Amino acid sequence: MRCLFLFFTCCFLFHSSAQTLTLVELNCENLFDCEDDSLKQDEDWLPTAVRSWTPKRYWRKQNHIAQEILSCQEETVPDLIALVEVENDVCLRDLTKRSLLRNAGYQYLMTESPDVRGIDVALLYQPLKFRPICYDTYHIQPIEGMRPTRDILYVSGLIASDDTLHVYVVHAPSRYGGERATRPNRQLIANRLIEAIQQLPENAKVVIVGDFNDGADDPALQFLENHSLVNITRHTTGSHGAKGTYRYQGDWGSIDHVFVSSVLLDFVEQTYINDAPFLLEEDKKYGGVKPLRTYIGPRYQRGFSDHLPLVVRFRFGPI
């Protein structure tokens, strides 16, 4: 575990009767740069590949991700952003320093996982609202027949109310190969999370966020709930027709979730899906609307992501 030596200034240690903290989770749908990494299978994301992943498309994607984040709440930017499916530090540096987010002041921590495609998870944070104390990455040892997967990112930090928040960012193994056949792969993630949380102090304020590739009632997520974690986004919807963060063959569902320890329940003020109209398109085959994604197979759609942002607002202070 890496611990950060921080010098706290008066601009961070402000106090009032209550402090809000907004968390956003977003699967970016393949935020890759345009350069070939010889150590990863990223050949689909090059200018010469079938998807024609050019610098122009890359920068449009960066600004689209920034737009999604900025549209998650009015007046101020989100305080914490858990991102899934980002390739590397280059992508995050461009997102935070050169995209439409460049003036927002975000800093970030991310994993460097053995995933064969090279995708990782990251946590963006506003330094005046969340100050990291320690961070670590938890490697998942594959079982027989399982490809190397994404590490879990762990970050503990101080928020403005002087509470310590323990944040875990997850991108669980996919269902490729069949849900039942791959179920043990996702159970590994749940097991590792519980092992980690059991090492924390009693009544620790824990947030687990990410793409679990499972629904709320699937075994791995039920395992988390059986260990005193609460899925606070189980029934979360949007205000423009989204009944989940993801739509497959006309059916809305949520494989993106936020779990918290029970001690945090009283501090949850609101949960919602950001389904702003510009993030949606008509579903001509099944009716209704669906996320306006970047690609459908190799066909470029000029969109945002195949997932919608999941938003949680906490209020810390006197209850």
Residue spans for each PLM region:
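Active-site environment of divalent metal-dependent phosphoester hydrolases
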Residues: 88-90, 116-118, 175-177, 213-219, ...
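Extracytoplasmic, non-cytosolic globular domains
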Residues: 153, 157-237
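Second-shell loop/turn segments in exported
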Residues: 49-56, 77-83, 110-111, 141-143, ...
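Metal-dependent phosphoester-hydrolase catalytic domains
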Residues: 195-206, 214-319
